[in-house]
Amino acid sequence: MAEVAPAPAAAAPAKAPKKKAAAKPKKAGPSVGELIVKAVSASKERSGVSLAALKKSLAAGGYDVEKNNSRVKIAVKSLVTKGTLVQTKGTGASGSFKLNKKAVEAKKPAKKAAAPKAKKVAAKKPAAAKKPKKVAAKKAVAAKKSPKKAKKPATPKKAAKSPKKVKKPAAAAKKAAKSPKKATKAAKPKAAKPKAAKAKKAAPKKK
């Protein structure tokens, strides 16, 4: 049973690429409505273009009218309801059709108005690019303030205090200088011994 279960799981991913491949051709090329508008605009007939003439022009442009006959009719109806086409003869998809000049002229100014908006948006983008300059200026100000904080360390003061401790050996030297005085005091009694010798020498004179 464990060997049979992985087989459906392997088959499922294989189906997904087929759906993607089928979806790609739909995106390529202009829509049916665009082709119909081009065909009607190309015709010079004052009374309008019939549905049969539209199909011939679409077929000449490489569009498969036989397979997409229903799409052509739906597209014609939708263009009439939108106001892009005006139906001069007949009803529904059958009859003759003309371009609605007012609708076409209204679309052109709308496209021109959309173009300046795009330019304004492009002009606003450089303004957004200027913001990093302000950030850079703030960083520069922060960099200027940081040296002030660097001055706070009191290590040089401690180094200046240390020489005071060095002066203590000088006091020890003074004590050492005082000690020879004591040595001289101790040496004075030695000098008194010759006096005693002189006294002994003077004793024989009494005899």
Swiss-Prot record:
Record-listed N-acetylalanine modification sites: 2
Start and end residues of each H15 domain: 28-101
Biased composition (Basic residues): 16-27, 117-168, 175-207
Temperature dependence: Thermostable up to 80 degrees Celsius.
This protein's UniProt keywords: Acetylation, Antibiotic, Antimicrobial, Chromosome, DNA-binding, Nucleus, Secreted
SUPFAM superfamilies: Winged helix' DNA-binding domain (SSF46785)
Region (Disordered): 1-28, 105-207
A GO cellular component entry from the record: nucleosome
Site (Cleavage) location in chain: 138-139
Annotated compartments: Nucleus; Chromosome
Tagged with keyword Nucleus: yes
InterPro entries, sorted: H1/H5 (IPR005819), Histone_H1/H5_H15 (IPR005818), WH-like_DNA-bd_sf (IPR036388), WH_DNA-bd_sf (IPR036390)
Superkingdom of source: Eukaryota
Chain intervals with Low complexity compositional bias: 1-15
GO biological processes: defense response to bacterium; nucleosome assembly
Protein role: Histones H1 are necessary for the condensation of nucleosome chains into higher-order structures. Oncorhyncin II has antibacterial activity against Gram-positive and Gram-negative bacteria at submicromolar concentrations. Potentially important role in mucosal defense.
Family of this protein: Belongs to the histone H1/H5 family.
Name of protein: Histone H1
